[in-house]
């Protein structure tokens, strides 16, 4: 890792900015939390498929198992969040609490991706093994599963609230901007 391209530093700064902004409470449309994890899944599968073209079903099974485990952890993490809802002219909005877990996930993902790419680019002998591919897929599954689980939890609670069967009854609606 003698020389990293300039876009890597720009990407790092962008990820830090996104992660820091998620540390503060924010008001979003209910579909917004699910967009980032879906993009994360697509980009990750594409990247891993190109990095490990010889990866077999065992690597994808490890990714799926890790994704399910990460999503479960993310679901339980978001379950304790106290959400607030508001309906305005732009539709339903949900106020999400500030949470540093996305910042940590983004930074861990950046480190893992940099490590994987560097190991392959420098032709490390262990990077060509099937075990490295399986571990790479599993790490990706965990890191993408956690935000996916949190997002699915938030979207599910928004749907329940919209249908009138919300468990958020004790949470006051937040004020309009």
Regions found by a protein language model. Give the residues of each.
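C-terminal ends of transmembrane helices
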Residues: 15-29, 75-87, 151-157
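Structural signature of hydrophobic alpha-helical transmembrane segments
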Residues: 1-13, 61-68
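C-terminal membrane-adjacent module
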Residues: 102-177
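Helix-coil boundary and interhelical linker segments in multi-pass alpha-helical membrane proteins
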Residues: 1-3, 49-61, 123-134
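Alpha-helical transmembrane segments
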Residues: 57-72, 137-142
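Select subsegments of transmembrane alpha-helices in polytopic membrane proteins
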Residues: 6, 33-38, 75-78, 98-112
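Cytoplasmic-side transmembrane-helix entry/capping segments in multi-pass membrane proteins
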Residues: 28-41, 58-66, 92
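A cytosolic-side transmembrane-helix exit/cap motif
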Residues: 52-58, 78-91
């Amino acid at each position: 890792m003698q020389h990293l391209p300039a876009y890597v530093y720009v990407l790092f700064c962008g990820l830090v900015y996104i992660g820091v902004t998620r540390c503060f409470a924010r008001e979003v449309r209910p579909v917004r939390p699910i967009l980032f994890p879906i993009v994360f899944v697509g980009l990750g599968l594409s990247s891993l498929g190109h990095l490990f073209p010889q990866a077999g079903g065992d690597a994808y099974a490890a990714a799926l198992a890790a994704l399910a485990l990460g999503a479960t952890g993310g679901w339980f993490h978001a379950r304790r969040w106290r959400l607030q809802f508001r309906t305005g002219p732009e539709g339903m909005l949900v106020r999400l609490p500030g949470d540093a877990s996305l910042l940590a996930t983004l930074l861990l993902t950046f480190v893992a991706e940099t490590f994987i790419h560097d190991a392959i680019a420098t032709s490390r002998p262990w990077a060509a093994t099937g075990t490295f591919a399986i571990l790479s897929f599993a790490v990706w599954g965990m890191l993408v599963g956690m935000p996916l689980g949190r997002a699915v939890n938030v979207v599910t609670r928004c749907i329940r609230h919209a249908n009138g069967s919300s468990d958020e009854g004790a949470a006051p609606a937040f004020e309009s901007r």
